[in-house]
């Protein structure tokens, strides 16, 4: 039986709350990957079942090499998630949300891992007519 769940963005608000829930409701071991651009170490939970790894999703294959045969599912929250800052940091936003997410999707596909992906309402805009108002929305809508 596969014994691990991976959460990208595990030191962020959504990821850390999901880790808390999974610790209470499951027996899985949890691997959190976060680059700490917005996530915080203060969100870490003290549990022997959680392993925190600093890293970027663009390197997910290397980061999870030793775990890949034991991963049941992967929750992908680890992306550049600031709309205003995406205008000033387009390259960083594109690298994380487009290239990093592609690497996560490929990793899951290649290793037959269930993927749970969190999108954003910013991709919809006004009935989809203005969905690309920010670099953030553009990169998310293309995933």
Predicted regions and their residues:
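N-terminal Rossmann-like NAD(P)+-binding domain of SDR-like oxidoreductases, especially those catalyzing
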Residues: 1-143
């Amino acid at each position: 039986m596969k014994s691990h769940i991976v959460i990208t963005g595990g030191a962020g608000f959504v990821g850390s709350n999901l880790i808390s829930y999974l610790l209470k409701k499951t027996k899985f071991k949890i691997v959190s990957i976060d680059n700490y651009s917005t996530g915080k170490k203060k969100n870490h939970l003290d549990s022997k079942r959680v392993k925190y790894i600093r890293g970027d999703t663009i390197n997910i294959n290397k980061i999870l090499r030793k775990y890949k045969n034991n991963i049941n599912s992967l929750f992908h929250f680890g992306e550049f998630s600031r709309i205003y800052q995406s205008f000033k940091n387009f390259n960083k936003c594109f690298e994380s949300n487009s290239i990093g997410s592609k690497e996560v999707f490929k990793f899951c596909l290649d290793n037959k891992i269930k993927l749970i992906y969190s999108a954003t309402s910013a991709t919809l805009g006004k009935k989809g007519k203005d969905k690309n108002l920010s670099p953030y929305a553009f990169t998310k809508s293309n995933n």
